[in-house]
Amino acid sequence: MHRVAVVTLRGYREWTESLGPRREHIIQRVQAGLHMALWRHFTSIGAFPHHTRYDAAVALVNNIPTTLIEKAVDKLKKASPVPVEYCIGTGPTPYEAYLSCGEAAGDGDNYAVLAHMDMVDSTHVTRANGPLHVYLQILHIISDLGDLCKRLGCIALYLGGDNVAVLLPEPKAAYEIAERVPVPVRVGVGVAKRPYTAFVKATKALDYLRSHGVVGVKVLK
């Protein structure tokens, strides 16, 4: 089983509205701090976190003790202007674990499987068409992956640039993803007991594909 934590900021919208109309620069500064704190404290326990919205985040927490997750959330609270809540779900896929959040927080003892994906030759495309073109392509890919992941049981997350992370149920799902996205991609896949270790392996696999000029999927266990 896979295990996913969902972190939410209670009353965040009301807090933003309390700042008045000249507020966006304050909101963006706070959100940057929240993003930094989320990554610092969750990766320090071996989890893989990411914001879905800045008032909510998900984290793959396979094989991470609940006590450590609680400590990470407690540290995140110090960066938040509002109360922080979380729940944990388990399921046969990361997506199903996300959907079951709060219902049954089992052990989540499956090995974590993560992908690190990027577009092929995005630097050339950016030079030719500008960064907005690539950004819109990535948004299109994320949208396509959102629908595909509902069937495969994965969760796709935008990392910035032309990089996407995908929480996978198993390595073979990466091959279908690579086939179905609308542009050529490289997909590094990592498998490990702890999620962040799996993502480090995925990045190593992606770096190998990049350095060897290979398009496709590489799995590192």
Swiss-Prot record:
Its EC number is 3.5.4.29. Keywords: GTP-binding, Hydrolase, Nucleotide-binding. It catalyses: GTP + 3 H2O = 2-amino-5-formylamino-6-(5-phospho-D-ribosylamino)pyrimidin-4(3H)-one + 2 phosphate + 2 H(+). GO terms for biological process: biosynthetic process. It is an enzyme of class 3 (hydrolase). Pfam families: GCH_III. Coiled coil: none annotated. GO terms for molecular function: GTP binding; GTP cyclohydrolase IIa activity. Disulfide bonds: none annotated. InterPro entries: GTP_CycHdrlase_3 (IPR007839), Nucleotide_cyclase (IPR029787), Rev_trsase/Diguanyl_cyclase (IPR043128). HAMAP family: GTP_cyclohydro_3. PANTHER family: GTP CYCLOHYDROLASE III. Belongs to the archaeal-type GTP cyclohydrolase family. This is GTP cyclohydrolase III. The gene is gch3.
